[in-house]
Curated annotation (Swiss-Prot):
Residues 50-57, 121-139, 220-236, 293-313 are cytoplasmic. It comes from Homo sapiens (Human). Odorant receptor. The gene is OR1M1. This is Olfactory receptor 1M1. It is found in: Cell membrane. InterPro entries: GPCR_Rhodpsn (IPR000276), GPCR_Rhodpsn_7TM (IPR017452), Olfact_rcpt (IPR000725). Keywords: Cell membrane, Disulfide bond, G-protein coupled receptor, Glycoprotein, Membrane, Olfaction, Receptor, Sensory transduction, Transducer, Transmembrane, Transmembrane helix. Belongs to the G-protein coupled receptor 1 family.
Length: 313
C-alpha cells in the first residue's frame, strides 16, 4: 500500500438517501416540510410548558427536555442534507464530520434515556400516587437530567476520540446522509475492534437497558391498571400511557435495529431508513403524539397561540 494513502481523511463524501438526481427535488421538498413541522411543533411545546405554570411538573419537564433534544437531533442532520440536495455539494470536512457525529450521539443518548425517565414517571404516578410528589420532585428531575447531559457528553466525546485515532484509505464515500459511527468505521483501513466493542457497550447501556426498564415499568403499570375498579379510571390511565408507548415503539424500534443487530443483517437501505425514522420522523411526530390526547397541553398551546394573535393585532 502506498504511504500517501495511510493518512487521515481530509473530507468525506456523503452520498445521501438516493444517488438518483431526479429524486433530489422530491426529497428536498419532503424533508424541508418535515423539518419545518418539527421545528414549529417542538418549539411550541417548549414555549407552552415554559409559560404555563400549571405545567411545571416532572412529566412536562421531561417532555420539554424531549422536545428540545428532538429539535437539536434533527437540526444536527437534516439542514446539512437539505443543503446537499439543493446545491449538489456532498462533501463534508473530517473535523465537521466528527462534530456532527459527536452531537448526533450526544442528543441521541439523552433522547433515549429521557424516554425511559418518562416511563418511570408514569409508573410512579399510577402505581404510587400518594408518594409521587416526594419521589418525583422537580429538584430531583433537574439533577437527573443534568447528570444525563454530563454522562452523554462524556460518552460522545469518547466515541470521537476513538474515531480520531483511525486511519482512512481508499474510498471516502459514505453511503449515508450524515456522519454516523458505523458507516465511517467501514471506510477505515485500521483495526476498528475497540470502536465496535465500545459501540456495543454503549448501546447496551443507553438503548437496551432503558428499553428493559420501560418494559418493566409498563408491566407494573398494566397490573396496576387492571386492578382499577372503574372502567373510566382504566381508560384514563391507558390514555395517559398510550402516547408515550407510541414514542417508545417509534424510537426504540429503529435504534435497536441499527445499533444492536448484527452488521450482516443490517443493509445500507435499512440503515438509512431507520436513521430517517429517529432523526426526522420521530422528532416531527412527537409533538402531535403528546398533545393530541392531552387536554392540559392542548389548553396551554391554545393560550400561547391566542396570546401571540392578541399581541400582534
Amino acid at each position: 500500500m502506498e504511504p500517501r494513502n495511510q493518512t487521515s481523511a481530509s473530507q468525506f463524501i456523503l452520498l445521501g438517501l438516493s444517488e438518483k438526481p431526479e429524486q433530489e427535488t422530491l426529497l428536498f421538498s419532503l424533508f424541508f416540510c418535515m423539518y419545518l413541522v418539527m421545528v414549529v411543533g417542538n418549539l411550541l411545546i417548549i414555549l407552552a410548558i415554559s409559560i404555563d405554570s400549571h405545567l411545571h411538573t416532572p412529566m412536562y419537564f421531561f417532555l420539554a427536555n424531549l422536545s428540545l433534544v428532538d429539535f437539536c437531533l434533527a437540526t444536527n442532520t437534516i439542514p446539512k442534507m437539505l443543503v446537499s440536495l439543493q446545491t449538489g455539494s456532498k462533501a463534508i470536512s473530517y473535523p465537521c464530520c466528527l462534530i456532527q457525529m459527536y452531537f448526533f450521539h450526544f442528543f441521541g443518548i439523552v433522547d433515549s434515556v429521557i424516554i425511559a425517565m418518562m416511563a418511570y414517571d408514569r409508573f410512579v404516578a399510577i402505581c404510587h400516587p400518594l408518594h409521587y410528589a416526594k419521589i418525583m420532585s422537580l429538584r430531583l428531575c433537574r439533577l437527573l437530567v443534568g447528570a444525563l447531559w454530563a454522562f452523554s457528553c462524556f460518552i460522545s466525546l469518547t466515541h470521537i476520540l476513538l474515531m480520531a485515532r483511525l486511519v482512512f484509505c481508499g474510498s471516502h464515500e459514505v453511503p449515508h446522509y450524515f456522519c454516523d459511527l458505523t458507516p465511517i468505521l467501514r471506510l477505515s483501513c485500521t483495526d476498528t475492534s475497540v470502536n465496535r466493542i465500545f459501540i456495543l457497550i454503549v448501546a447496551g447501556m443507553v438503548i437496551a437497558t432503558p428499553f428493559v426498564c420501560i418494559l418493566a415499568s409498563y408491566a407494573r403499570i398494566l397490573v396496576a391498571i387492571m386492578k382499577v375498579p372503574s372502567a373510566g379510571g382504566r381508560k384514563k390511565a391507558f390514555s395517559t400511557c398510550s402516547s408515550h408507548l407510541s414514542v417508545v415503539a417509534l424510537f426504540y424500534g429503529t435504534t435497536i435495529g441499527v445499533y444492536l443487530c448484527p452488521s450482516s443483517v443490517l443493509t445500507t437501505v435499512k440503515e438509512k431508513a431507520s436513521a430517517v425514522m429517529y432523526t426526522a420522523v420521530t422528532p416531527m411526530l412527537n409533538p402531535f403524539i403528546y398533545s393530541l390526547r392531552n387536554r392540559d397541553l392542548k389548553g396551554a398551546l391554545r393560550k400561547l397561540v391566542n396570546r401571540k394573535i392578541t399581541s400582534s393585532s
